[in-house]
């Protein structure tokens, strides 16, 4: 910080590694900590630069923001400060630190320039901000910004009075909250012996108030359970069987009417109709099978005659009694059949 930077007071535009652009006036550069401090800073956001997390611009103007040099992607000097004359009419010269001149008569009430006045546009070496910047050390990882870009910045009024105080309604991070509740104060230690004596007195008083009488309760005779098993009767006498049901008039045939009423109450009228339909269809199927079996029997009976058409048509249709090919069993009686 001994050497003054020639761009102090210039308007700077820098872009961080998150592609966020900031504009402000260069206040100081710390080469030891590799930090740059800007005053009157405004954030313009990412400005349509390709980034994973776009950030919108903000209209807020922050008094001071300190940036870490390693996290700055680009830096541009927009405007340099104008050369101002130093006291006494001397031109601006970085080699001049202070100027002393003769005191002029204070006709208009303005104070005269005192000896040792600092150069215009350059901060004092012992300014509070310079001391704060020199004492800053980079933190572990991340973006160490002591004056972060949010609304919780100090209201700068003529200096850094109060450090990080006077924030706009935000709590100081890292500062524990003060509990304003009043703590109980005890004049002396708690006496356990006195407390036990009071407890014993209260317990004795409560016991004296109780009326305890020894009353013997009458003994209640236990009722004996009746025998649940009679050896005289057999275990199998009450089991249902066909002989008992016949003796009582019960038959082994199911009562389809009662069963239908029970099914209708349980499953509904449509379910009972579907059950009847399935039962009837099965009966017709069985009848058809029997008919098909009869056809097979007839067909087999027809083919028992190896002779030809005579026996087959005579058995089924009742026609063609004459003519045709005679069976093999009747070859000896062919002439007799022709005579008839």
From Swiss-Prot:
<dbReference type="InterPro" id="IPR025761">
    <property type="entry name" value="FFD_box"/>
</dbReference>
<feature type="compositionally biased region" description="Low complexity">
    <location>
        <begin position="312"/>
        <end position="325"/>
    </location>
</feature>
<dbReference type="GO" id="GO:0035770">
    <property type="term" value="C:ribonucleoprotein granule"/>
</dbReference>
<dbReference type="GO" id="GO:0005737">
    <property type="term" value="C:cytoplasm"/>
</dbReference>
<feature type="region of interest" description="Disordered">
    <location>
        <begin position="101"/>
        <end position="148"/>
    </location>
</feature>
<dbReference type="GO" id="GO:0033962">
    <property type="term" value="P:P-body assembly"/>
</dbReference>
<dbReference type="GO" id="GO:0000242">
    <property type="term" value="C:pericentriolar material"/>
</dbReference>
<dbReference type="GO" id="GO:0006397">
    <property type="term" value="P:mRNA processing"/>
</dbReference>
<keyword id="KW-0805">Transcription regulation</keyword>
<dbReference type="InterPro" id="IPR010920">
    <property type="entry name" value="LSM_dom_sf"/>
</dbReference>
<keyword id="KW-0508">mRNA splicing</keyword>
<feature type="compositionally biased region" description="Polar residues">
    <location>
        <begin position="126"/>
        <end position="148"/>
    </location>
</feature>
<feature type="short sequence motif" description="TFG box">
    <location>
        <begin position="251"/>
        <end position="271"/>
    </location>
</feature>
<dbReference type="GO" id="GO:0003729">
    <property type="term" value="F:mRNA binding"/>
</dbReference>
<dbReference type="GO" id="GO:0043186">
    <property type="term" value="C:P granule"/>
</dbReference>
<dbReference type="GO" id="GO:1990904">
    <property type="term" value="C:ribonucleoprotein complex"/>
</dbReference>
<feature type="compositionally biased region" description="Gly residues">
    <location>
        <begin position="280"/>
        <end position="296"/>
    </location>
</feature>
<dbReference type="GO" id="GO:0010628">
    <property type="term" value="P:positive regulation of gene expression"/>
</dbReference>
<keyword id="KW-0694">RNA-binding</keyword>
<feature type="compositionally biased region" description="Low complexity">
    <location>
        <begin position="101"/>
        <end position="125"/>
    </location>
</feature>
<keyword id="KW-0539">Nucleus</keyword>
<dbReference type="InterPro" id="IPR047575">
    <property type="entry name" value="Sm"/>
</dbReference>
<dbReference type="Pfam" id="PF12701">
    <property type="entry name" value="LSM14"/>
</dbReference>
<dbReference type="GO" id="GO:1990023">
    <property type="term" value="C:mitotic spindle midzone"/>
</dbReference>
<dbReference type="InterPro" id="IPR025762">
    <property type="entry name" value="DFDF"/>
</dbReference>
<protein>
    <recommendedName>
        <fullName>Protein LSM14 homolog car-1</fullName>
    </recommendedName>
</protein>
<dbReference type="GO" id="GO:0034063">
    <property type="term" value="P:stress granule assembly"/>
</dbReference>
<comment type="similarity">
    <text>Belongs to the LSM14 family.</text>
</comment>
<dbReference type="Pfam" id="PF09532">
    <property type="entry name" value="FDF"/>
</dbReference>
<keyword id="KW-0804">Transcription</keyword>
<keyword id="KW-0747">Spliceosome</keyword>
<feature type="domain" description="Sm">
    <location>
        <begin position="1"/>
        <end position="81"/>
    </location>
</feature>
<dbReference type="GO" id="GO:0000979">
    <property type="term" value="F:RNA polymerase II core promoter sequence-specific DNA binding"/>
</dbReference>
<feature type="domain" description="DFDF">
    <location>
        <begin position="178"/>
        <end position="214"/>
    </location>
</feature>
<dbReference type="GO" id="GO:0072686">
    <property type="term" value="C:mitotic spindle"/>
</dbReference>
<dbReference type="GO" id="GO:0005681">
    <property type="term" value="C:spliceosomal complex"/>
</dbReference>
<dbReference type="GO" id="GO:0000932">
    <property type="term" value="C:P-body"/>
</dbReference>
<dbReference type="GO" id="GO:0008380">
    <property type="term" value="P:RNA splicing"/>
</dbReference>
<comment type="function">
    <text>Transcriptional regulator. Involved in modulating embryonic expression of ATP-dependent chaperone cdc-48.1. May play a role in mRNA gene silencing, and RNA granule (P-body) assembly.</text>
</comment>
<dbReference type="GO" id="GO:0005783">
    <property type="term" value="C:endoplasmic reticulum"/>
</dbReference>
<dbReference type="InterPro" id="IPR025768">
    <property type="entry name" value="TFG_box"/>
</dbReference>
<feature type="region of interest" description="Disordered">
    <location>
        <begin position="277"/>
        <end position="340"/>
    </location>
</feature>
């Amino acid at each position: 910080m001994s050497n003054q930077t020639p761009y102090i007071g210039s308007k700077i535009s820098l872009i961080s590694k998150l592609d966020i652009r900031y504009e402000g006036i260069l206040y100081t550069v710390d080469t030891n900590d590799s930090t740059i401090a800007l005053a009157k800073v405004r954030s313009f956001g990412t400005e349509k630069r390709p980034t994973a997390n776009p950030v919108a611009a903000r209209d807020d103007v922050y008094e001071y923001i300190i940036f870490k040099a390693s996290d700055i992607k680009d830096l541009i000097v927009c405007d340099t400060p104008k050369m101002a004359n130093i006291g006494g009419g001397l031109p601006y010269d970085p080699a001049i630190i202070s100027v002393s001149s003769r005191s002029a008569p204070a006709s208009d009430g303005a104070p005269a320039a005192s000896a040792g006045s600092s150069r215009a546009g350059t901060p004092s070496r012992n300014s509070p901000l310079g001391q704060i910047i020199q004492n800053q050390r980079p933190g572990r990882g991340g973006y160490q910004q002591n004056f972060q870009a949010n609304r919780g910045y100090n209201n700068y009024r003529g200096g850094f009075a109060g450090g990080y105080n006077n924030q706009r309604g935000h709590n100081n991070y890292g500062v524990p909250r003060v509990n304003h509740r009043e703590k109980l104060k005890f004049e002396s230690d708690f006496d356990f012996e006195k407390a036990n004596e009071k407890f014993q007195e209260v317990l004795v008083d409560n016991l004296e108030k109780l009326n305890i009488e020894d009353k013997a309760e009458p003994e209640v005779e236990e009722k004996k359970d009746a025998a649940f098993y009679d050896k005289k009767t057999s275990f199998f006498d009450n089991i249902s069987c066909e002989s008992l049901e016949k003796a009582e008039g019960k038959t082994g045939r199911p009562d389809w009417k009662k069963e239908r009423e029970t099914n209708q109450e349980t499953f509904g009228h449509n379910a009972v109709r579907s059950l009847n339909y399935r039962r009837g269809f099965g009966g017709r199927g069985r009848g058809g099978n029997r008919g098909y079996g009869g056809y097979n029997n007839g067909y087999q009976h027809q083919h028992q005659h190896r002779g030809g058409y005579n026996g087959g048509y005579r058995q089924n249709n009742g026609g063609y009694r004459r003519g045709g090919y005679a069976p093999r069993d009747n070859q000896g009686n062919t002439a007799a059949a022709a005579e008839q």
